[in-house]
């Protein structure tokens, strides 16, 4: 029986490459001269440190640009609240989303069921398994999922006939 998996994975090596590019750009840009702006990653968290809110906003733009350049979807970033750090600096934690969360998984299952496609959907941990009798039904399911406005990048893997 044909099937495929819906996952949300982020390539951490590409994230590291993007962060290295941001660090290089911050070191060379004129508007960051003498500032204490930095980005660093620890596991699934990125810490952004900036002098003030305007520099933090610029760092967000740099994150978006460099992630897109490295073919990492910026939707994979979950920005936490901005907090004061030592001195006059501000810090923000950014979580890298990995895996399809249960709330999103239930929403995707509901959307597929509402479309009345001839497929079965099963939630397996942090991924979805979609099975059907015909390959065409699975391709319709992929097209439906791509049309949905999801706040997280989705990949479709293990397409088996």
Swiss-Prot record:
CDD domains: YajQ_like (cd11740)
InterPro entries for this protein: DUF520, UPF0234-like_C, UPF0234_N, YajQ-like_sf
Cellular component GO terms, alphabetical: cytosol
Keyword Signal found: no
Domain of life (superkingdom): Bacteria
Molecular functions (GO terms): nucleotide binding
The entry's keywords: Nucleotide-binding
Pfam families, per the entry: DUF520
Protein family membership: Belongs to the YajQ family.
Function: Nucleotide-binding protein.
Protein name: Nucleotide-binding protein amb3630
Annotated source species: Paramagnetospirillum magneticum (strain ATCC 700264 / AMB-1)
């Amino acid at each position: 029986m044909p099937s495929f998996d819906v996952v949300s994975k982020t390539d951490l090596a590409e994230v590291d490459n993007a962060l290295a590019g941001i660090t290089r750009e911050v070191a060379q840009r004129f508007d960051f001269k003498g500032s204490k702006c930095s980005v660093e990653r620890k596991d699934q968290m990125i810490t952004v440190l900036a002098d003030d809110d305007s520099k933090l906003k610029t760092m967000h733009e740099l994150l978006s640009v460099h992630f897109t350049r490295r073919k990492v979807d910026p939707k994979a970033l979950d920005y936490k609240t901005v907090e004061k750090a030592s001195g006059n600096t501000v810090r923000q934690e950014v979580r890298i989303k990995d895996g399809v969360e249960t709330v999103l998984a239930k929403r995707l299952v509901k959307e597929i069921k509402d479309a009345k496609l001839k497929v079965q959907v099963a939630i397996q941990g942090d991924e979805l398994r979609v099975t059907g009798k015909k390959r065409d039904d699975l391709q319709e399911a992929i097209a439906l999922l791509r049309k949905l406005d999801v706040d997280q990048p989705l990949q479709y893997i293990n397409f088996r006939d």
